[in-house]
Amino acid sequence: GKTAFGLGSKSIHVNSIILDDSQACIDSIKNSFTIKVDNESDLYKSILNIFSDELREQGEGSYLEIQNGVGNNTLLPIPYWSWIDKKELVAQELLKNIEDKRVSFIWPLIKNEIHNCQAFLSGEYLEISPIFSLIDSFGSFSKANHRFLMSATTQDDSFFIKGLGFDVEAIKKPLVNPDLVWSGEKMILIPSLIDETLDREKIINWLLRPNDKRTFGTVCLAPSFANIKQFQRIGAIVATTETIYDCIEKLKRGEFSNSMVFANRYDGIDLPDNSCRILIIDSKPYSETLTDRYEEECRPSSDIINVKTAQRVEQGLGRSVRGEKDYSVIIITGGDLVQFLKSPLTTKYFSPQTRMQIEIGGQIVGFAKDEIDEGAEADKLFVGLINKSLQRDEGWKEYYVESMNEIDIRDRKDNLYDLISLEYKAEKLFIKGDLDKACDV
């Protein structure tokens, strides 16, 4: 809200604007519209008090958990009708906390749109965000003559339409290099499918323990800090907001004896070459915001929710392979993530490249299972598969290239874009107050 480019009519005109690494920009843009304060803040306590009756009516137990700060996984929405009725009280509380940077940077954007905002409370924090994107406030972006988004993958194509106001045809037909269908080598392995003894606990305790002879980085992407004690007990280093840069630099300097764990960091970290040759993705990613978590609870089988999850996973898969000649073994643990990758109901949400990589991994796991049936040891077979990548086995490399070259890049799911575009059109009409037309869209 304090952009140097100006807001609204005071925005500086820009001819062309480029968003590099646009999937990371999406989170930054969403955060720029969102007030998020912890349960120790005065604003949190005030909003909880103002809407205590409305929250209690939704569930006495859930309300008490939130009130006592113990319901970290519990969240409740503030009903929109109560929010609208008490919007002036909300505005007053926001102004009382205007010196808080978590409020002051957002206030200029939402101060006249309180009625079009939504709020959620958990035992940890309060989240207030607009129901509709306010990207038009940034005239330097929304009114630029040319807008370019650059990315190897996209976390949320729907946000490009509803959040950035891009035309659906531009999203359906991105500019791509037809000669670069895929890049880099990813051996995706699901050890529990080789043998049931290779479960999450065994893999985590085995591969993440310290090893002074390790000649490459071993990294784990976890969905949250919930298992931090397990990782620390093993001897892994768990990166925090304050230490994440130093942890990445240690890997790039060749300090490999301790494995690294990054919680909820599926984008924004690059671990090329030897900085990460083994990447463990542990369990399915969580929704980052209370808004997304609530939507996921209400619509667990929604196509849009599943697309977001798939693209989040794909971002994680790309952390350790950062170039055409790069390679990495990616190990999948956690029953929920394994099911998401293997179920026909959800595999379809991945890109053609990722689907092929999952298929390749499934085929070589199948070969390993056949050997187990003949009496081979599961642990040794698993290590043998990993070494085919790490030791640059020619047979493996040829098999991977031949399989990846069969990808059809035209295999792209566009069916959601038209629906999202209609939602965006209806929202724009609603904001203008044309309710009848909004309902008819």
Task: Give the role of each language-model region.
Residues 1, 16-19, 146-151, 259-263, ...:
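Structural recognition of the conserved hydrophobic beta-strand(s) that form the central parallel beta-sheet
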Residues 1-10, 246-251:
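Inter-Walker segment of RecA-like/P-loop motor cores
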Residues 3-4, 23-24, 266:
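Catalytic acidic motif of RecA-like/P-loop NTPases
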Residues 11-12, 32-37, 162-169, 234-239, ...:
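Short secondary-structure boundary/capping segments
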Residues 13-216, 223-231, 356-385, 395:
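Conserved coupling segment at the C-terminus of the helicase ATP-binding
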Residues 124-125, 192-206, 237-253, 259:
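Beta-propeller and closely related beta-pinwheel folds
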Residues 193-194, 250-340:
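Conserved RecA-like P-loop NTPase helicase motor core
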Residues 226-227, 323-441:
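Long, largely alpha-helical accessory region at the distal end of helicase-like NTP-driven motors
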